[in-house]
Amino acid sequence: MLSNDILRSLRYTLKVNNNDMVRILALSAMESTSASFDTWTTKEDEEGFVRCPDIILSGFLNGLIYDKRGKDDSAPELALERRVNNNTVLKKLRIAFSLKTDDIQAIMSEQKYRVSVPEITAMMRSPD
């Protein structure tokens, strides 16, 4: 799945427009424009499609965490990942929406994905 697909899905799920997405990205100290988000949320087979860099998706997810949970000035800044995978996206969404393991399992089973609690905790572990 491309970063563009994830951004597009989040845009529709959160019911936000490009200006809101620029605002959320800015919370992670990154800059962009509404026009950039317009090209990043364009479907791959449509004219005007531009591939979204992973670091932008990472910044947007960090901004979403700050938007939903607030920024803790005593904590270090969230790291920007240059390579984003599905586990990273899931971890950041879990933090942003304060989801517990049971919540993730319920969401996955509602979407017809069979996943156990140990599998979810394994996905959330650091890759170290």
Predicted regions mapped to residue ranges:
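Generic detector of well-ordered alpha-helical segments enriched in charged/polar residues
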Residues: 38, 57-65, 90, 121
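Short, solvent-exposed interaction modules
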Residues: 62-114
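Intrinsically disordered, low-complexity basic tails/linkers immediately adjacent to helix-turn-helix/homeobox/MYB/SANT
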Residues: 48-70
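A cross-kingdom feature marking solvent-exposed beta-strand/loop segments within repeated
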Residues: 1-8, 16-52, 75-78, 85, ...
